[in-house]
A protein has these predicted regions:
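C-terminal helical subdomain
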Residues: 163-166, 173-221
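Conserved glycine-rich Rossmann-like NAD(P)H-binding loop of the short-chain dehydrogenase/reductase
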Residues: 25-39
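The beta1-alpha1 cofactor-binding region of Rossmann-like NAD(H)/NADP(H)-dependent oxidoreductases
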Residues: 36, 56-68
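Conserved glycine-rich cofactor-binding loop
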Residues: 10-12
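Hydrophobic positions on the long internal alpha-helix
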Residues: 68, 83, 107, 114-122
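Catalytic loop of short-chain dehydrogenase/reductase
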Residues: 88-89, 101-108, 114, 128, ...
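A glycine-rich helix->loop->beta "capping" turn
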Residues: 48-51, 71-84, 209-213
Length: 221
């Protein structure tokens, strides 16, 4: 059995992705900062027949991300899919003229250093799985492609992450590893035809299985 590692796993999109991939036979590694919440989520997923386990890590600490991903592999099996989708902190979102150099440190650690550390950790295992197996999924808000003057930190950092993801797509595609980005404009809304977590999880599954595009965007704002 292979696994999906979800960095930024929570009760919304993360849980929906866990259920979707779990139903397809994946074990699920849940990664976020709060171990207690992860344990509760894993218990809920188990009721639906999903084999899941939580591993606490801070995305702004590359060593903790690497350790958590190593534990996923050791406990649940090789990581076939990595999803990077942590929710940015509210203090990352400041107006452009009020944003100082210090204000950008957190967003850049969160949205660039974190995924770089994660990718470096999972790549050897994905290469070992062979061509057309491994997938790296990035989930971003609309500011990744349309910067907002009042959310400067995430606009700058998400743009950097998007560039990194596209470069990975170009290079790793030659090795049969898919790299894709799901852009979700606005909030995730339960029951919405486009932005319900289960609907979005379906798009992420399609990006993994169809392997035919870099970016899928849900609304512009």
């Amino acid at each position: 059995m292979t696994s999906i590692a979800i960095i930024g796993a929570g009760t919304g999109l993360g849980a929906a992705v866990a259920r979707h991939f779990g139903a397809e036979g994946f074990a699920v590694g849940l990664i976020s900062r709060n171990q207690e919440r992860l344990d509760t989520l894993a218990e809920d997923l188990a009721k639906d027949g999903v084999r899941a386990k939580g591993f606490a890590a801070d995305v702004r600490d590359p060593a903790s991300i690497a350790k958590a991903l190593e534990q996923v592999t050791e406990t649940l099996g090789p990581i076939e899919v990595l999803q990077y989708s942590p929710l940015p902190q509210k203090d990352f979102m400041r107006p452009v003229l009020e944003t100082t150099p210090a204000d950008l440190v957190g967003p850049i650690e969160f949205s660039i250093y974190g995924p770089v550390a994660a990718v470096h950790q999972v790549l050897p295992g994905m290469r070992f799985l062979g061509e057309n197996r491994g997938t790296i999924l990035f989930v971003n808000g609309g500011s990744a492609v349309k910067p907002g003057r009042n959310v400067t930190g995430t606009s700058v950092a998400f743009a950097g992450q998007a560039a990194y993801a596209q470069l990975l797509n170009e290079v790793l595609g030659e090795e049969g590893i898919q790299v894709s980005q799901l852009i979700i404009g606005g909030r995730i809304i339960e029951g919405d035809a486009e932005k319900d977590p289960a609907v979005l999880a379906g798009h992420l599954w399609d990006l993994h299985t169809k392997r035919d595009r870099f970016r899928h965007q849900i609304s512009a704002d």
